[in-house]
């Protein structure tokens, strides 16, 4: 096999020497360069194909391993993220429940205090109403007693005044009647006097 590769090399070398050398710069060259041709044997071609196949197998295996590793790492990351998210969700849910329970407890306490306050206000209002009603009734009784006393006094005063007026009227009547009797008697007496004195003339 070495002999074949040596022969191939020497053949390639001799062919390459057969072309004229061009020492001028390539950008000034207008003639095309001929590419070197390498002659390979069937064995080297087979060996190359086998190497390419092995390289392709290795690349395929490495790609598969890399893909599996990425899948595994992605699955682990997803599981970890899911676990963390579930833990955070549970923690948030627990905190929300605690907050809700605390708020419910405070709302219950506030409701109880409000009911107690309403009961106290209602009781105080009823007590104040009863006191006011009692005071009003007492004041009404006093006013009624006062009015009754005033009425009795007025009645007594009116009756007393009526009696006094009656007495006064009787006094006046007696006086007037007495005077009129006196006047009548005097008039009769004067008339008699005159008549007797005219009889003498």
Swiss-Prot record:
Residues 41-54 have a biased composition (Polar residues). Keywords: Stress response. Residues 57-76, 108-144, 177-193 have a biased composition (Basic and acidic residues). Residues 41-155, 177-201 are annotated as: Disordered. The keyword DNA-binding does not apply. GO terms for biological process: cellular response to desiccation; cellular response to salt; response to wounding. It comes from the Eukaryota. Induction: By desiccation (leaves) and by abscisic acid (ABA) (leaves and callus). Belongs to the LEA type 1 family. This is Desiccation-related protein PCC3-06.
